[in-house]
Amino acid sequence: MRVLVLGAGVVGTTSAWYLARAGHQVTVVDRQPVAGNETSFANGGQISVSHAEPWANPHVLPRVLKWLGREDAPLLWRWRADPAQLAWGLRFLGECFPGRVRRNIAAIVSMALYSRGRLQALREELGLQYDHLERGILHIYTDRDEFSAALDAARVMRQFGLDRDTVDVDKCLEIEPALSGARHLLVGGDYTRSDESGDANKFTCALAEHAKAAGVDFRYGLTVERIATSGSEIVGVLVQHSEGGPERLTADAYVVALGSYSPLLLRPIGVGLPVYPAKGYSATLTLAEASLAPTVSLTDDERKLVFSRLGNRLRIAGTAEFNGYNLELNPVRCQALIDRTRQLFPRLEIVGEPTLWCGLRPATPSNVPYIGQTRYRNLWLNTGHGTLGWTMACGSAASLAEMISGRRPEPEFPFLRC
């Protein structure tokens, strides 16, 4: 079968790989000049099954009220004259009830555990190098109320098979000695030994090269303009060349893996997709003295930040700014990343200035992505992974390839139709 994948981020590229391995003839189109050049470019770097608690949960409303008026708030909502933003926000509130949160955690943990296993197998098979570390993820807490709330979520995750262990401050420092300068700030943590970290951009570029060798055709510099339909089928995709005119591409099946831009393409053909961009920030520091920086990946739950060691670099990433498709760097939010890093690692030494970046995460109200078939028989989705695109990429892609090939996917997951 000829399959056209729209998007060459980590989700689109893994989709192309698994589809090619399933025997399909695959073409990937992307507006960028290389794979992994947008949302996958400088994210937090965590393979974090332990990050499965959805943003929508019973604790979020008090937190949002506490953060009102703060430009550096972990979650910043900028009201816009945008019906999609309002509709998304209302659905988000509906996902905050305990029963829905438990259901969403179950789905995310199931897919994330499966995906981590597929990533490990792929890394071993292909010998992929992407600054990966298998030292687990330590969630740290500097607020006792936040720590108490996190214990409830950790208990639920353990019920679904995740090894998330509660630890005291001494154990936090034993796991990651680089936190010794922040001992007076910490109140506790929890640790998932089986989690990992690595550079999503390096992984995506490396896998794209293997996919090319396996026969996948990557066509860069093509902007997807619209999808053409006839009845219950997709009959083509119109693209615009960065240097040239339009072109119509056809295939037997089509996969939309365009992240936050997916709903803009799907809305005109009647596929409503509650995905909204959540802008995340990152700062990448080149280390002057490696021994002073963490090697265990960290999640600062109070500030919604993650810290991942990537070779001789330290990546700090996180927060969520709901501001439409705006990609401007907010200097206050950028500085908040640096300030928190200095608080936690006061002895850290770096070379030069931090490299600052922001990207748009495709967030669903439930944090559960959309993977599966639409009402058009040959149109498939793999999008809406929010902060967990890197974590769930391999599992989502392998599952999608199974479904397109007419087989039942392995994970227990609510594969959705729109």
UniProtKB/Swiss-Prot annotation:
Q: Which UniProt keywords apply?
A: FAD, Flavoprotein, Oxidoreductase
Q: Which reaction does it catalyse?
A: a D-alpha-amino acid + A + H2O = a 2-oxocarboxylate + AH2 + NH4(+)
Q: List the disulfide bonds.
A: none
Question: What is a biological process (GO) this protein takes part in?
Answer: D-alanine catabolic process
The protein's Enzyme Commission number: 1.4.99.-
Q: Which InterPro entries match?
A: DadA, FAD-dep_OxRdtase, FAD/NAD-bd_sf
Give yes or no: UniProt keyword Magnesium.
no
GO MF, one term, reads:
D-amino-acid dehydrogenase activity
Q: In which pathway does it act?
A: Amino-acid degradation; D-alanine degradation; NH(3) and pyruvate from D-alanine: step 1/1
An example of a Gene Ontology cellular component annotation for this protein is: cytoplasm
The residues that hold FAD are 3-17
CC cofactor: FAD
Q: Which Pfam family, giving just one, matches this sequence?
A: DAO
According to its UniProt entry, what is the function of this protein? Oxidative deamination of D-amino acids.
What name does the UniProt record give this protein?
Answer: D-amino acid dehydrogenase
